[in-house]
A protein has these predicted regions:
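Short, surface-exposed linear segments at secondary-structure transitions and domain or protein termini
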Residues: 21-35, 169-175, 220-230
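Zn2+-dependent peptidoglycan hydrolase active-site motif and core
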Residues: 126-170, 194-200
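Surface-exposed, glycine-biased beta-strand/turn segments
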Residues: 64-146, 178-179, 188, 222-232
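Surface-exposed, beta-sheet-biased, low-hydrophobicity segments with strongly acidic/polar composition
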Residues: 1-83
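Conserved, short, structured surface segments that act as functional micro-motifs
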Residues: 114, 147-149, 175-232
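Envelope-exposed proteins and targeting segments
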Residues: 2-4, 32-34, 59-61, 66, ...
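Short histidine-centered loop motifs in beta-beta connectors
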Residues: 118-119, 124-125, 155-182, 206
């Protein structure tokens, strides 16, 4: 676990996060009208390596903060994959450790979120995707099939999604995707001890690219599943 003390409107608040436990899938704090996701701190990298995907913050701590009356994004988010009933379970994150920042092999902070499901599980575009492609593939000589997709919002921010261990793409690379369109079958290439897909979420804005816990997106997907019907 890791903690911080933040001062908001002259009042101190102590925030605590756990990773590699069920509490990895936490509710954000709502304080004085702000929704706060306490994403990461540098201190844990005194004893954890960063050898399984980028995830260390550039400063002492990393937060995602927004107006608590707003959604994570302006439109409903379609499930990225079939959502496990009842929410994500830490025991279904590869070997029970590979949530965001979880200790992969007990020693390396995990730069993504693993969700166990069978090889060939459909993956869908959570929102419209402007461009997408394999940035690594077995065919190109890499040890994995890794997909990347981008969406640019009206305010200029770009959201970057990645999914690894892809069995195959089901659409042509660089073809724009509509929300809910299947783009791949997941979990089938170099997935190790348990078939799973590895999800990554980045935000590019103001000239910087920031990695964030993919749980933030999945949290909104579960919220939206209660209020919207999606076709796949």
């Amino acid at each position: 676990s890791f903690t911080c003390v933040v001062k908001i409107n002259d009042t101190e608040h102590t925030l605590e996060r756990e990773v590699s436990t069920q509490r990895s899938f936490y509710e954000p704090w709502v304080i004085d009208g702000l929704r706060i996701w306490f994403d990461a701190v540098q201190d844990i990298f005194d004893f954890l390596a960063e050898a399984h995907g980028e995830c260390c913050p550039r400063k002492h701590a990393r937060f995602a903060i927004q107006d608590a009356t707003l959604r994570i994004c302006p439109e409903p988010i379609h499930p990225w994959c079939p959502l496990p009933e009842g929410g994500l379970k830490i025991e279904h994150c590869y070997r029970g450790e590979d949530c965001w920042l979880g200790a992969y092999n007990g020693a390396s902070a995990h730069g993504g979120l693993d969700i166990n499901h069978p090889a060939g599980t459909p993956l869908w575009a959570p929102f419209d995707i402007d461009d997408h492609y394999y940035f690594n593939s077995v065919e190109m000589g890499h040890n994995n099939n890794r997909w990347r997709g981008m969406h640019r919002w009206e305010n200029g921010a770009e959201w970057i999604l990645q999914a690894h261990h892809m069995t195959e793409l089901t659409v042509q690379e660089h073809k724009p995707l509509k929300q809910g369109e299947q783009f791949a079958r997941g979990a089938g290439v170099w997935s190790g001890d348990a078939e799973h897909s590895h999800f990554v979420f980045k935000v590019h804005d103001y000239g910087e690219t920031i990695l964030l816990d993919p749980w933030i997106l999945f949290w909104q997907m579960y919220q939206d599943q209660q209020h919207f019907s999606f076709e796949s």
